[in-house]
UniProtKB/Swiss-Prot annotation:
One of its GO terms (biological process) is endocytosis. Residues 107-126 are annotated as: Disordered. Coiled coil: none annotated. This is Equatorin. The keyword Glycoprotein applies. It is a single-pass type I membrane protein. PANTHER family: EQUATORIN.
Length: 294
């Protein structure tokens, strides 16, 4: 781009030098050039480095396009703007010599015409921010330098974790409610199983106790026939002696309750025999008493 400007500016100088070149009479403030001024300019040119135009060989072709605008005051009292666009870094040396006013005036007028002759789409591009090229961003990423991001470059940023976690945060209350419901269901199931187990244990204990009570009653059963036969009725007119003898005979021939349980029929027969013997002995004693009284 600089190379094109360097070609374009000398052509404009050669075409319009007759019309734009002011005379010394028209510019009274301009002084003639001296040898000292030329020497100072040569020294300044020696100190200023020469920047080669950007091309593909030197690696500066993909640098950012920068625009510089300078305002200068003309001897007539008007101001002119100098606009420079370049793809490389520029260093400007400002000189405060009065002898250079003629050349600056010529340059300002030429650059004003060039800026007005530029198409409108270039002016529109100036207002938009300069987006760094892909290769410059890649080089800066490799070198480890910080890259300044513009508005358009924000599209390349990764999604922040806060935005990702926002959707997950909405689902967290649902998960918490589900966990609480599961815990309540498990606790209710355990309580129900405990109640069922307790009822089963109480029922089995009641049955075992009832069976043991029945077994005790079966061991000590009473035969009603034997109870009526062994029961003595004193109202039948038997004397005390016969009662005592019958008691002695019953004790002498008596049987225990265990013998009665073992053989129910044998005990009944023995009781009958003892009753018969006791009755016979009572009758004999009664007859003897009557004979003695006679």
């Amino acid at each position: 781009m600089n190379f094109i400007l360097f070609i374009f500016i000398p052509g404009v100088f050669s075409l319009k030098s007759s019309t734009l070149k002011p005379t010394i009479e028209a510019l009274p403030n301009v002084l003639p050039l001296n040898e000292d001024v030329n020497k100072q300019e040569e020294k300044n040119e020696d100190h200023t480095p020469n920047y080669a135009p950007a091309n593909e060989k030197n690696g500066n072709y993909y640098k950012d396009i920068k625009q510089y605008v300078f305002t200068t005051q003309n001897p007539n009292g008007t101001e002119s703007e100098i606009s420079v666009r370049a793809t490389t870094d520029l260093n400007f040396a400002l000189k405060n010599d009065k002898t250079v006013n003629a050349t600056t005036y010529e340059k300002s007028t030429i650059e004003e015409e060039t800026t007005t002759s530029e198409p409108s789409h270039k002016n529109i591009q100036r207002s938009t921010p300069n987006v760094p090229a892909f290769w410059t961003m890649l080089a800066k990423a490799i070198n480890g330098t910080a890259v300044v991001m513009d508005d358009k470059d924000q599209l390349f940023h990764p999604i922040p974790e806060s935005d990702v976690n926002a959707t997950q945060g909405e689902n967290q209350p649902d998960l918490e409610d589900l966990k609480i419901k599961i815990m309540l269901g498990i606790s209710l199931m355990t309580l129900l199983l405990f109640v069922v187990l307790l009822a089963f244990c109480s029922a089995t204990l009641y049955k075992l106790r009832h069976l043991s009570y029945k077994s005790c009653e079966s061991q000590y059963s009473v035969n009603p026939e034997l109870a009526t036969m062994s029961y003595f009725h004193p109202s039948e007119g038997v004397s005390d002696t016969s009662f005592s003898k019958s008691a002695e005979s019953s004790t002498f021939l008596g049987t225990t309750s265990s013998d009665m349980r073992r053989s129910g029929t044998r005990t009944s027969e023995s009781k009958i025999m003892t009753d018969i013997i006791s009755i016979g002995s009572d009758n004999e004693m009664h007859e003897n008493d009557e004979s003695v009284t006679r």
